[in-house]
Amino acid sequence: MKLVTFEIKTVLGPFTRLGALWDKYVVDLNLAAAARFADLGQLEPRRLADALLPPDMLAFLDLGRDALAEARHALEFAAAGMGKNRAPEGPRGERVVHGRDDVLLLAPLKPRALRDFFAYEDHALKAWARAGSSLPASWYDHPMYFKGNHREIYGPDREVPWPSYTRRFDFEAEVACVVGRTGRNLSRLQAHTHIAGFTILNDFSARDMMKSELACGMGPGKGKDFAYGLGPCLVTVDEAGPEEDLEIQVWVNGELWSKGRTGDRYWSWGLMLSHVSQEETLYPGDVLGSGTFFRGCGLDLERWVNPGDEVELRVDKLGSLRHKIGKPQAQTRLKYERG
């Protein structure tokens, strides 16, 4: 399934809902479940749907496999109705199925935590070669990652701000894994069963600020935490595969800049999740980025985006994630006197 979070306009203002992409439609899963329960003769279908298939992605992930099973039943029920040219309605006449153009797709979830790895060897080798040194042997000991700002999330077709303190704005084309079950001290094999699915991540970067931070052995901080692109949907493991190997492409203003394979990672998802879980708990809704593939960023390509450019990441099975790059405010420099 392709799970989404979407916004629908109502007379009471915009509502945010959990949905699934089906053909050219977006199905409201909570209301589809309520319609199904009403069809089965349940006395309180809305209350049952809210308990078993809540309309919020994080609450849905918290319920694990049972909620996923209910989502499949709800989607099948809605699809069967559409196949008979009879769009299902909620118990109070609510609209269950929407045209894609009638809703606004948001980021599929608000991550509870965000970690981003450095899992592609060729990209890592290139990064150290640029600095005039060889890749540290410790890179091969265990997967390296940093913790990002999980609150600065930009969904599909949003404008991403250009920080006033950078002249080297960049993108990084990545796939992200979404955790679906709580786990701690997981083995590599156990970790696979804790994956809810995958989505596309654009790890936006201020390269000049990153250079300053990393030179002091800290960060990235301001070099990364201003924006992360996420979306358009959360594709479940059965559809994407537990160790997805998909073509990923970078398009800028309609021009293909680069392409690669997501499966070229040095580290597997099972190992990366297992590593994070050692003496630390993973929670549903945690998001882990893979890091970018070689030539999956402007730095590797030695090409830079400009204000107003449109950056689009396309990944087989996962969809397309587009963002417009905003215009910077007056240039500032983050350099201070002591105090």
Feature roles, as predicted:
Residues R17-K24, E302-R303:
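Surface-exposed flexible segments
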Residues W22-Y25, A32-R36, P111, T262-W267, ...:
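A short, sequence-level motif marking secondary-structure junctions
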Residues M1-L12, L21, L31-V252, L256:
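Active-site microenvironments in enzyme catalytic cores
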Residues P14, S205-G339:
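Catalytic-pocket segment enriched in acidic/His residues
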Residues V11-L18, D28, R322:
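Short N-terminal binding/cap micro-motifs at the start of the first secondary-structure element
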Residues K2, L18, A119, E174, ...:
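Residue-level marker of beta-strand positions
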